[in-house]
Each structure stands twice: as structure tokens, then as C-alpha cells.
UniProtKB/Swiss-Prot annotation:
The gene is rplE. It comes from Bifidobacterium adolescentis (strain ATCC 15703 / DSM 20083 / NCTC 11814 / E194a). It comes from the Bacteria. PANTHER family: 60S RIBOSOMAL PROTEIN L11-RELATED (PTHR11994). Part of the 50S ribosomal subunit; part of the 5S rRNA/L5/L18/L25 subcomplex. Contacts the 5S rRNA and the P site tRNA. Forms a bridge to the 30S subunit in the 70S ribosome. The keyword Lyase does not apply. This is Large ribosomal subunit protein uL5.
Length: 190
């Protein structure tokens, strides 16, 4: 007779580090009495604006393909709300794509971003630590998609940048910065 036990999926490495090391450290640092008060990452939004898609609608397909490879999730396409003649833009035309990551996929993406993608940037000296929005959320941009190992450098048709928003449960920028620093975000020291 064969053993039919099913193993639970492995917990993402960064999530495990957060639960076992970071929560107790932040609890002490901010004098919380309950671990549920500690700030946590709620979601990560990865978006690509493809302004040139106003002239060539095929470009949006490349952005969707790249985002799917990078995040492991199918992106939602954003469309123009208004027509703007100067930009050759019509209402309802596809001009970008975004993915909202939560749960296990979010932790896996953050781990890959921090350990593999950011170190691959040429002349990388850290990310700007001033881009918090006043609500505890952090935004930063990347100039090209080739830093992710999922993207084959030979198959890139256009260089596309992307914006990444990390939404935290705290409303305090200082606390959010400490959380992200503990997670491994390489902020520039001023």
C-alpha cells in the first residue's frame, strides 16, 4: 500500500523571515503589546504604462506578456478615460497594464525582487527612501524589465519600465520604512 499524504506548500522564505524575526523585532522597537499591531505588507501593485500603445496597439501585448512572466499572474489592462487629440489617444484605448499581488505570490515576488532583480541593475547604489506617500505606502520605479531573470534578454522587443507600489498596513511612513528596511529593501543612505 502506498502512502498518500499530501505535503502543505512551502511558506515563502521572506514571509517566514517576517513572521519569525521581523515581527518580534518591530514589536520591541515600537513597544507593541500585541503582534497584530505590527505593520505588515498588504499588497504589491506592479504596473506598466505603455504610452506608445496609443500609436501601435501591438505594444500592449508585449507589456502583458512581460508582466505575466515577472509576476506569475495575468495583468489587468488599463484603458484611456478620455480622448486626447495631441497624444493621438482615443477613449477606451489600451494604454497600460497592472497586477495586484497578495498572499504567497506577493511574498515570492518581493523575495525575487530584493534578492535577484535589484542586484542585477548596473551601478545600483540603492533605491530612494523618500518616495513614501504619507500613508505608509512606498512607490518606486524600475527603468527596464530585463533585470528579472524570467525575461529572456534576447526576446525583448522594447524596453519597458515599471512602477511598483508596496502597500503596508500602517499609516506612518517612519514605521513603514523600518518594516521595509527589515525586509531587505536597499534604501540609499543620505
Amino acid at each position: 500500500m502506498t502512502d498518500t499524504t499530501v505535503e502543505a506548500p512551502a511558506t515563502p522564505r521572506l514571509k517566514q523571515k517576517y513572521n519569525e524575526q521581523i515581527v518580534p523585532e518591530l514589536e520591541k522597537e515600537f513597544h507593541y503589546s500585541n503582534p497584530m499591531q505590527v505593520a505588515r505588507v498588504q499588497k504589491v501593485v506592479v504596473s506598466m504604462g505603455v504610452g506608445a500603445a496609443a500609436r501601435d496597439s501591438k505594444l500592449i501585448e508585449g507589456a502583458v506578456k512581460d508582466l505575466t512572466l515577472i509576476t506569475g499572474q495575468k495583468p489587468k489592462i488599463t484603458k484611456a478615460k478620455k480622448s486626447v487629440a495631441q497624444f493621438h489617444l482615443r477613449e477606451g484605448q489600451a494604454i497600460g497594464a497592472y497586477v495586484t499581488l497578495r498572499g504567497e505570490r506577493m511574498w515570492e515576488f518581493l523575495d525575487r525582487l530584493l534578492t535577484m532583480a535589484l542586484p542585477r541593475i548596473r551601478d545600483f547604489r540603492g533605491i530612494n527612501g523618500d518616495q513614501f506617500d504619507g500613508q505608509g505606502n512606498y512607490n518606486f520605479g524600475l527603468t527596464e524589465q530585463s533585470m528579472f531573470h524570467e525575461i529572456d534578454p534576447d526576446s525583448i522587443d522594447h524596453q519597458r519600465g515599471m512602477d511598483i507600489t508596496v502597500v503596508t498596513s500602517t499609516k506612518d511612513d517612519k514605521e513603514a520604512r523600518v518594516l521595509l528596511k527589515h525586509l531587505g529593501f536597499p534604501f540609499k543612505e543620505n
